[in-house]
Design a protein with these regions (language model features):
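ATP-dependent adenylate-forming carboxylate-activation enzymes
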Residues: 56, 77-90, 104-106, 221-241, ...
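Conserved AMP-binding/adenylation subdomain of ANL enzymes
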Residues: 174-197, 201, 205-245, 259
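Conserved AMP-binding/adenylate-forming
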Residues: 20-23, 39-86, 409
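Gly/Ser/Thr-rich phosphate-binding loop
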Residues: 152-154, 218-219, 243-248, 259-321, ...
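ANL superfamily adenylate-forming
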Residues: 109-154, 162, 169-183, 259-260
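AMP-dependent adenylate-forming
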Residues: 3-26, 124
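ANL superfamily AMP-binding
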Residues: 13, 28-53, 84-85, 89, ...
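AMP-binding/adenylate-forming catalytic core of the ANL superfamily
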Residues: 83, 100, 236, 246, ...
Length: 510
C-alpha cells in the first residue's frame, strides 16, 4: 500500500526514525510533507514524465521529497554525494533534469555546478539556490489533483565510459498505489511487513537503499535512518530500536567483524530476523563469520539497477550451497547462455541473462541497450556464472572489469580517460585489486611515455592529477608502472591479464 494509506490507518506510527537523535516522523507527517512536495513540483511547472534530481546526504526529508515525486508522476534522479561538480553536470545534462535539490552540507560542490537547472537548497543556504523548506511550508498539504505514479531513474554501474540512466518501463497501473513487485518480494521472501523496524545503513542515492526503504514504507514498517555507517553505531541502533531487518554490503560486515570482541558482545542483536546483503561479492569466510555471530539471518540477493531480474537465497539455503546468490524469484526467468545466445546446461559457465516480462532501456543510449540483449530478447548485466541442477546461481565474474569498492561501483574507463591525458602517460589500465576492508581498491597501471622515469614522484603527481577532476572514490589508491601494457595488434587491451596479476589466477576470459 502507498504510505498515504498507512497515514490514514496508523497516522501516529513512525515511518522514519533518525538513528542518531531518535527523532520520529509519523506516517501522517510523511504524507503531508510529500503532498507539499508534490504541490511544489507542480507549482514549478513540473509535469508527469519530467525529471528532477536530488543531491543530498541522508536526511529524513529525502523521503518526503522522493515520495512527493513518486505521487506526481516524476522521474527522480538521486546523485551520489561523492561526485564532483563536472560529474554531476554530466548527469544533470544527460538526464534532462529540470530541478535540482541540493543539501547545504554539500555546498562547495553544489556551488560549482554549472548545468542550467532550477535549484533548491535543503538544510541551509547555498549561493544561487532557493531554500526548499520555506517553499514547502507555503504549499497546501492536500494531494495534487492529477496524482499519478512516478519512479526512480537511477544511474547504473558502467564498465566503459560514464554511467547511464536506467529507464524502467512505467507501471501498467498509473495509480500511485499500484503493486510494486519489489515490495511483494520483500514481504514474501524476506518477511518484511508492518512490524518491520528496518535499519538503513547506506546512502539513499544508491538504488538498493532507496528501493528497500521505500518498500518498507509501502509495507507499513519503520525505517531507522543512519546518516552514515559506523559499525559500533549500527550495533547500538539495532539494540536501541530493536531493529529486525536491515540492508548491508560486505564492507559493512568486514568492519563489524573487525570490532574488538568486547565491543561486539556489548550489544544485543537478537532482534534481527533478516540482514539483507548485496552490492558486491561477499567473501565466504566473512559471510560465515556473520552467520556464526548473528545466526542464520544473513540473507542475500543478486540484482541490478536495471531491475531485469532478481535472485535471492536465505542463510539456511546458503549454508547448503555456499557461494550461491540464490534462485530466480519474481516474474523474470534466469538463463545461462553462450556468446551466441544459446542456453547452456547446468554447471556450465556463461553469461547470466534474465527474461523479464517488461524490460529496461539505457537513457540516450540505444546501442548500449541493444548490447544488453541476446537473440531471444533476454537481457544481461554482463555478469558470468553458472547454475546447478536446482537452479541456484553461482557468479564467477562480474561486469567487465567494473570495480566494486566498499559497495560503490567505479567505472575504470572514466579514470583511464582522465589519466591518459597527462603528458607523462603513454597508456593506462585501471583495475580492481583485493583489499581486506573495501573488497577492492582502485589500481592504475601506467605505461609512461619514453624518457619519463617511473617512481614515487610520478605516482604522487598522477594522484594529484586525478584528484583535480575525479571524486575521491575514483582516485587510484595505488599506481604501478610497466614498460608496456598487453595490447593486441588491433589495439584491444587484454585487461584480464592485468587484473589477474593482482588476484593471483590465470586468465580465462579476455
Amino acid at each position: 500500500m502507498h504510505p498515504y494509506r498507512h497515514a490514514a490507518a496508523t497516522p501516529d506510527k513512525p515511518a522514519i526514525i533518525v538513528a542518531e537523535t531518535g527523532q520520529a516522523i509519523s506516517y501522517a507527517e510523511l504524507n503531508a510533507r510529500s503532498n507539499q512536495a508534490a504541490q511544489l513540483y507542480r507549482a514549478q511547472g513540473l509535469k508527469p514524465g519530467d525529471k528532477l534530481a536530488f543531491f543530498l546526504e541522508n536526511t529524513p526529508d529525502c523521503f518526503a521529497l522522493v515520495w512527493g515525486a513518486q505521487r506526481s508522476g516524476l522521474l527522480f534522479v538521486c546523485i551520489s554525494s561523492k561526485l564532483t561538480a563536472p560529474e554531476i553536470d554530466y548527469i544533470l545534462s544527460d538526464s534532462g533534469a529540470k530541478l535540482l535539490v541540493a543539501g547545504a552540507s554539500l555546498r562547495s560542490v553544489a556551488e560549482a555546478i554549472t548545468a542550467e537547472v532550477k535549484r533548491f537548497s535543503h538544510g541551509g543556504s547555498i549561493d544561487g539556490y532557493d531554500p526548499v523548506e520555506a517553499l514547502l511550508d507555503a504549499q497546501p498539504s492536500a494531494p495534487i489533483a492529477d496524482e499519478c505514479a512516478g519512479s526512480a531513474m537511477l544511474y547504473s554501474s558502467g564498465t566503459t565510459g560514464r554511467p547511464k540512466g536506467v529507464l524502467r518501463p512505467p507501471p501498467e497501473d498509473p495509480a500511485i498505489d499500484h503493486v510494486v513487485p519489489l515490495a511483494m518480494l520483500a514481504n514474501m521472501f524476506f518477511g518484511l511487513g508492518p512490524d518491520t523496524v528496518y535499519l538503513s545503513t547506506a546512502p539513499l542515492y544508491h538504488a538498493a537503499p532507496l528501493g528497500w526503504t521505500m518498500c518498507v514504507h509501502i509495507l507499513g514498517g519503520t525505517v531507522v535512518l543512519m546518516h552514515h555507517f559506523e559499525p559500533e553505531a549500527a550495533l547500538a541502533n539495532i539494540e536501541r530500536y530493536r531493529c529486525n531487518a536491515g540492508q548491508f554490503v560486505p564492507t559493512h560486515f568486514v568492519r563489524l567483524l573487525k570490532l574488538p570482541e568486547e565491543v561486539r558482545r556489548r550489544y544485543d542483536v537478537s532482534s534481527m530476523k533478516t540482514a539483507i546483503h548485496a552490492a558486491a561479492p561477499c567473501p565466504l569466510p566473512v559471510k560465515q563469520a556473520m552467520i556464526d555471530w548473528w545466526g542464520p539471518v544473513i540473507d542475500e540477493y543478486y540484482a541490478g539497477t536495471e531491475g531485469n531480474g532478481f535472485t535471492a537465497i536465505k542463510a539456511a539455503e546458503w549454508l547448503q550451497r555456499r557461494g550461491s546468490v540464490g534462485r530466480a524469484i519474481g516474474e523474470a526467468t534466469l538463463h545461462i547462455c553462450d556468446e551466441d545466445g544459446n542456453e547452456l546446461p547446468p554447471r556450465t559457465e556463461g553469461m547470466v541473462f534474465f527474461n523479464p516480462p517488461r524490460s529496461f532501456e539505457y537513457h540516450n543510449d540505444p546501442a548500449k541497450t541493444a548490447e544488453s540483449r541476446n537473440k531471444h530478447g533476454w537481457s544481461t548485466l554482463g555478469d558470468v556464472g553458472w547454475v546447478d541442477e536446482d537452479g541456484y546461481l553461482f557468479l564467477t565474474d562480474r561486469k567487465s572489469f567494473m570495480i566494486i569498492s566498499g559497495g560503490v561501483n567505479i567505472y575504470p574507463q572514466e579514470i583511464e580517460n582522465h589519466l591518459v591525458t597527462h603528458p607523462a602517460v603513454a597508456d593506462v589500465a585501471v583495475v580492481g585489486a583485493p583489499h581486506d576492508e573495501m573488497g577492492e581498491q582502485v589500481v592504475a597501471v601506467i605505461q609512461p611515455v619514453p624518457g619519463v622515469a617511473p617512481g614515487p614522484e610520478l605516482a604522487d603527481e598522477l594522484t594529484a592529477w586525478c584528484r583535480q577532476s575525479l571524486s575521491g572514490v575514483k582516485t587510484p589508491r595505488r599506481i604501478d608502472f610497466v614498460e608496456e601494457l598487453p595490447r593486441h595488434a588491433t589495439g584491444k587491451l587484454y585487461k584480464r591479464l592485468i587484473r589477474d596479476r593482482y588476484w593471483g589466477k590465470e586468465s580465462r576470459i579476455v
